[in-house]
Amino acid sequence: MTGIVLISPGLMGTAVGRALLCRGHVVYCALSRRSDATRRRAEQSGFICCDSFGEAIGKSEIALSLVPPGQALNVARRFADHVAGLPAAPIFVDCNSISPPTARAIGRIIADVGAAAVDCGIFGPADKIGPENVIVVNGSEARAIASLFADLVEVKIAHGAFGGASAVKMAMSIITKALPALFLESTCASAASGQLDLMVGLFDRLYPGIMSFISRSLPTYPRHVARRVDEMHEIEIWLRDLGLSGAMTHSARQNLDRLRDAELSAERKWDLIALLDAVARHGVLAAEREGAVA
């Protein structure tokens, strides 16, 4: 049985925590800065809610960071502040969609206080952790974290310099985030020509694998598009670091920027056709919006 502090219990964090609970581990979280809804979700999931971040860390051997990409560095700094000087700090596992440069920066922050960091990428469904997921880990304690998840999911180790798991995550995300953005462009063009239903039907007939992915992922975007935009920014940071232009990624991010700015209902349970119709009707990708998104 391992004590694990979960930072924080959002959609994927809750799924990871529940899966670890089912394997007999103890999951802690500190929710002093979170909403009542988050606290209820954590308590209903069986997590132990601590009064402070420091208390949760003090009870744990492993800390899992699952936050929006833009918060990952600050979470690492906050963790480092709490464990500095401790004789034995938890292993810090960054499970966020961040670029390898950001992962390396986090690795340095954690190493500077004498703790160990693991770079981790989680692939597959975000609302449950099981056989459909794959986890990639990288770092000096990668095997320890691989053992933690081995009975839950398929685990792979990315060898080489720290940030290898994030490199795999970002490379995969170029496709998994850019494909929905490209599909929106395709469907807006077909909708403007009065052929949306036929085009989508043909896609389903001729490219069922792609259509299955689009049908599963794109309807979640009104709720999660801000995070997807952050992820695309992280990819652009990485591509620039590699000396690549990132032109396709940049263009896909612009489409997602527009979708975010359209502010389609995040609470509605969208089906694919309804979402595509709304994007077309709102002129989300209209030419007159050119220049409105940097």
What does each model-found stretch correspond to?
Residues F47-L86, P90-V93, I98:
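Rossmann-like NAD(P)-binding element
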Residues I4, I98-K177:
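Rossmann-fold dinucleotide-binding core
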Residues R268-A294:
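Short, basic/aromatic-enriched C-terminal tail that caps enzymatic domains
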Residues M1-G58:
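NAD(P)+-binding Rossmann beta1-loop-alpha1 motif at the extreme N-terminus of oxidoreductases
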Residues V26, I48, I91, A116, ...:
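Conserved beta-strand segments of alpha/beta enzyme cores
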Residues V168-D271:
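Helical "substrate-binding/catalytic lid" subdomain
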